[in-house]
């Protein structure tokens, strides 16, 4: 199981997270391109069997990001990075969770966010067969 936790800066994950993707999820290690024609190919994932969870924290409220900006942070991450590296699967969307207005929410709301993460991790631990 792979977990990513990152804040969003300027509608992207942090530069350190982006650099990690650039330097680790490289062609030849994470995926390769399969040619269809001379000018077109598609990615074949080498990490298809890996399980992934992502938690993204936003300073912004949900409404403008999900509507005006068409949820571009999550869409870019899942479609632009994860589908290359982990192959296409619906769980890449459902297991990428976003927490909104993090610097401005109450402690109670922040605790609720943390409980979501804890619940997911406990669920993952219980699925591990020893």
Task: Please identify what each model-predicted range represents.
Residues 1-75:
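Helix-loop-strand module that forms the ligand-binding subsite of alpha/beta enzymes
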Residues 64-130:
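Glycine-rich phosphate/pyrophosphate-binding loop and the adjoining helix
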